Amino acid sequence: MATLYDVPPEELIEALTETLADEDDIEAPDWAEFTKTGVDRELPPEQEDFWTRRAASLLRKVAVDGPVGVNALRSEYGTSKQGTTRYRVRPHQKTKGSGNIIRTALQQLEDAGYVETSENDGRRVTGDGRSLLDDTAGDLLTELDRPELERYA
């Protein structure tokens, strides 16, 4: 049986995005189209499926690193700020990602039953979330035609 560790993360997140798009609980709030993903960004994301893609990425991150809190996930989704994109005259500074986007997406994943809050530890994946990840990875492993992944099939 394939697990989420057996397939490339990019492929798994792409497949999870398609799966989570069908969920009623996972949908972008009204403010999401105007919100930047961090203080280092100048514009909001341009992807149409940004919210479900971020939720899929968060589900995988919580499964791999969990239990994990919002602040640790903010550090994961942050980048280095270098001043404006035009000049880049400042030295690199590490910035954190948007906590509101992460928190709201995690709350939606909780409502869908894929993530739960553990006492004083942060959030972790439920059994339903783990089975969704593993089933998606198994389906993806049979679809991928890559010789280096055949040992997992």
UniProtKB/Swiss-Prot annotation:
SMART domains (alphabetical): Ribosomal_S19e (SM01413)
Family in the record: Belongs to the eukaryotic ribosomal protein eS19 family.
Ranges annotated as biased composition (Basic and acidic residues): 120-133
Residue segments, region Disordered: 77-99, 113-139
GO molecular function: RNA binding; structural constituent of ribosome
Annotated InterPro entries: Ribosomal_eS19 (IPR001266), Ribosomal_eS19_archaeal (IPR027548), Ribosomal_eS19_CS (IPR018277), WH-like_DNA-bd_sf (IPR036388), WH_DNA-bd_sf (IPR036390)
Record's subunit section: Part of the 30S ribosomal subunit.
Name of the protein this chain belongs to: Small ribosomal subunit protein eS19
GO CC field: cytosolic small ribosomal subunit
Keywords: Ribonucleoprotein, Ribosomal protein
Lineage: Archaea, Methanobacteriati, Methanobacteriota, Stenosarchaea group, Halobacteria
Source organism superkingdom: Archaea
GO biological process, one term: ribosomal small subunit assembly
Function statement: May be involved in maturation of the 30S ribosomal subunit.
